[in-house]
UniProtKB/Swiss-Prot annotation:
GO molecular function, one term: rRNA binding
Region Disordered, residue ranges: 1-67
Keyword ATP-binding: no
Superkingdom of the organism of origin: Bacteria
Chain intervals with Gly residues compositional bias: 42-52
GO terms, biological process: translation
Protein name: Large ribosomal subunit protein uL15
Self-association state and partner proteins as the record states: Part of the 50S ribosomal subunit.
Length: 146
C-alpha cells in the first residue's frame, strides 16, 4: 500500500447535490422547496421566534430582573490556592496574575475561604470573605484591603 493508493471507505463520501439542474436529477423545477409560498421565495422564511402571528412565547412571558450597570465582577481566589506561595510572601493581585493563579482580572480580586491555608502570608486584595480573613490571621498572616 502506498500513499497514492489510499481511497476513502466506500460510502463515506458523496457528491454535492446540485439542485435546479433538470427533472432527471430528482431536484429540478422547485429544487426541493415545494410550491410557492413564503419559504419558496429567495430570501424567504420567517424570523426566529415567529409563531405565525400568534403572540410568541418570549412576549407571553413576563420580564424578570434587571442588569445592574454598576455591578463589579471580582476574580475569585480560594485559600488553598494561596498555599503555592512561600512563607512571608506578600500576595498582591499583580503576583496572582503573574503566577497565573488568576485568569483574567476584572474589577479586582476577592479571597474566599475554601480550603486551608498553612502559610504565613501578607495578602492584599480588594475583598475578603469574613471566614477567609479569620483563617489568614489564624495562620499568622495579615490581611490588607486595597
Amino acid at each position: 500500500m502506498k500513499l497514492h493508493e489510499l481511497k476513502p471507505a466506500a460510502g463515506s463520501r458523496s457528491e454535492r447535490n446540485r439542485v435546479g439542474r433538470g427533472m432527471s436529477s430528482g431536484n429540478g423545477k422547485t429544487s426541493g422547496r415545494g410550491h410557492k409560498g413564503q419559504k419558496a421565495r429567495s430570501g424567504g422564511g420567517v424570523r426566529p421566534g415567529f409563531e405565525g402571528g400568534q403572540n410568541p412565547l418570549f412576549r407571553r412571558l413576563p420580564k424578570r430582573g434587571f442588569n445592574n450597570p454598576t455591578r463589579k465582577e471580582f476574580a475569585v481566589i480560594n485559600l488553598d490556592t494561596l498555599n503555592r506561595f512561600e512563607d512571608g510572601t506578600e500576595v498582591t493581585p499583580e503576583l496572582l496574575i503573574e503566577t497565573r493563579a488568576v485568569k483574567g482580572m476584572k474589577d479586582g480580586v476577592k479571597i474566599l475561604s475554601n480550603g486551608k491555608i498553612e502559610k504565613k502570608l501578607t495578602v492584599k486584595a480588594h475583598k475578603f470573605s469574613e471566614a477567609a480573613k479569620q483563617a489568614i490571621e489564624a495562620a499568622g498572616g495579615t490581611v490588607e484591603v486595597i
